Amino acid sequence: MGSFKEIVNTVSNPTILFTSVVIIFPFIFPPSDWFEKWHRRLGLHHIWSKKAIIIAVIGMVAFFIYGLGDYNFQKIVLKPDNVPISGLIFLVVFFTWLAMNQAYSNDERLDDGKKPSEFYEAPNDKVLVWPDLVYVELISLIIASAFLLVWSIGLAAPIEEPANPTESPNPAKAPWYFLGLQEMLVYFDPWMAGVVMPSLILVGLMAMPYIDRNPENSGFFSYKRRRMAISLFMFGWLVLWIMLIIVGTFLRGPNWNFFGPFEYWDIHKLEALTNINFSEIIYIKWLNTGLPDSILLREIWGILVLLGYFLILPPLLAKTVFKDMYARLGSARYSIFVVLIIIALTLPIKMYLRWIFNLKYIIAIPEYFFNF
């Protein structure tokens, strides 16, 4: 079984894990007809069946039980701070499956000329607040309170000793809900990773249903009729947020190095890494000259790259990949949509640039505290 642990540790390397997820994702959540064709041909639509969720839950439970036999895995997973993230994995998997299962079921019903499962004709199209809703909320409140009571008794609160200014924890991790931001800080300047990126990702996720409006398909679960919007939403939610939290919780160890879930957290593990800016690649590596004294001349190449990315890419996408969406949304809504998308995509782009080229910043102007 040692080889199995080695395989898991290897696959858990974020460069391999993230690349695999990015490649597989559009086949699981197809955004277009081409991906939909392969989605069906590969039988991936069956993962939203009831049998699939049973197999998935059993598989995850079996993996966790097996992993608890390993000291390193047990130490990470059973840490009181990390227990909620273990639960988060199960909850995200289940509720993603639940929504997609209902969406696929409704798509089949609509294709057969039937009404969606959420449709009720009068007078049965309303649910009374009292007693129906209040009873359900009361029962949920009691169950949640009992669960939290058992949790608080069974798990010691992760409260440590008063902060010692002479001793820094290694690794120093933020609370789980900020671990996604802490992971972004590896690839972006603090103003970008701590304020701009998370704000735009959250605003983009909230704005998606309003940008891609479709009144005829509102009020019930459906995937087929809003594939592009749902696929992009799920990518932002699952890959750019949930996955970063999981990576920061389980795979980041001492000195903020990557470790597999079965790997010993060696505090002396050091990886030789020298990050360089885009201007240094251009002038020092390619042109074999020193950096110019002029800030504008030094950073002109990075500025041109970003201008091309933000000014040329949107109209290019409007004529190719997003051609149908541009016709449906119009110029104003499409502009908002595509700007939010390409800003969100700067995160995986910067991640790959760091992993492949050790690129730190495309534009680096520390004189004015502006780095991107």
Regions inferred by a protein language model and the residue ranges of each:
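Soluble extramembrane regions of membrane proteins in the secretory/endomembrane system
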Residues: 2-7, 74-80, 111-113
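Hydrophobic cores of alpha-helical transmembrane segments in multi-pass integral membrane proteins
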Residues: 9-38, 46-72, 81-107, 116-121, ...
